[in-house]
Amino acid sequence: KVKAGDMLMSIDLKNIKTIAKTLSNARRVKILGKNRTGLSALQFRYRLTKIGFDAEAITDGILMNQMQESLTKGDVVLIFTTRAEDLQYYELIRNISKNGVTTIVVTCTETKLIKQSNYHILLPSIENASTSSFLDNQTIMFVFIEILLAELAYKVNENYNHELKNQVK
């Protein structure tokens, strides 16, 4: 039997803290995903609203190409992809990295894409660990989103309190 809780224990919490800090300090955040991972991108965007954090989810390949030109240093692009096979993501990371954009990849497969990004989270693959064809890696993505959101909420609140203290001085 596959236990998602056991699988999630393999995720490095230091990486989550680093990614949360990177997102909280970003000028702009773009969250990318296609097909089912597009739903993960949208879910993360919706959940960010809960903590008052603004970001844009993009699930269309044409829009992903168009937004590359406007990204600069201080911006962060987070890509959700279960298999990291989409060649558009490789080209996108290559292009935006030249402008100093920070890239984060969240995936269930160890590929060259994670080596090209600044940060990555390698999630366990339920699909690969199970004999059932009905298990989908999106469940792991959604659980990860909640873990990252909890850490990000802490960072956003920490930044907000720091700004308030500076205003009082």
Regions found by a protein language model. Give the residues of each.
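Glycine-rich phosphate-binding loops that contact phosphosugars or nucleotide phosphates
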Residues: 25-143, 147-156
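Residue-level recognition of alpha-helical structural elements
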Residues: 12-15, 97, 160
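Glycine-rich phosphate/diphosphate-binding loops that line cofactor/substrate pockets in enzymes
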Residues: 14-26
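HTH-adjacent hinge/linker in prokaryotic transcriptional regulators
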Residues: 1-15
